[in-house]
């Protein structure tokens, strides 16, 4: 590998909206990032059903297309 062309590999801190935080190594320019979901609060890993709706997209879809009947 050529010397001096690769980005710096440094520690980055990640904080989830549930309060969980962890550290990992990356080439990101930031020292910390914020996550919406992680393995401690994601429904797949916790086994709890939860709807993650950003901006009311599901409601907007149902409002536009909910009145349509299925084809017979």
Curated annotation (Swiss-Prot):
> What family is reported?
Belongs to the bacterial ribosomal protein bL31 family. Type A subfamily.
Q: Name one GO biological process term.
A: translation
Which keywords describe this protein according to UniProt? Metal-binding, Ribonucleoprotein, Ribosomal protein, RNA-binding, rRNA-binding, Zinc
GO cellular component term, pick one: ribosome
Q: How does it assemble?
A: Part of the 50S ribosomal subunit.
Under Gene Ontology molecular function, one entry of this record is: metal ion binding
Q: Where does the UniProt annotation place the signal sequence?
A: none
Q: Which gene encodes it?
A: rpmE
Q: What InterPro entries does UniProt report for this protein, alphabetically?
A: Ribosomal_bL28/bL31-like_sf (IPR034704), Ribosomal_bL31 (IPR002150), Ribosomal_bL31_A (IPR027491), Ribosomal_bL31_sf (IPR042105)
State the free-text cofactor note.
Binds 1 zinc ion per subunit.
Record protein name field:
Large ribosomal subunit protein bL31
Please name the Gene3D superfamilies in this protein's record. Answer: Ribosomal protein L31
Looking at the keywords, is Ribosomal protein present? yes
Function, as annotated, reads: Binds the 23S rRNA.
Task: Keyword check for Metal-binding, yes or no.
Answer: yes
User: From which domain of life does this come?
Assistant: Bacteria
């Amino acid at each position: 590998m050529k010397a001096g062309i690769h980005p710096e590999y440094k520690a980055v801190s990640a904080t989830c909206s549930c309060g969980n935080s962890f550290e990992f190594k990356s080439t990101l320019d930031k020292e910390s990032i914020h996550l919406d979901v992680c393995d401690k609060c994601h429904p797949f890993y916790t086994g709890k059903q939860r709807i993650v709706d950003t901006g009311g997209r599901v409601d907007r879809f149902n409002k536009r297309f909910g009145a349509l009947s299925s084809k017979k």
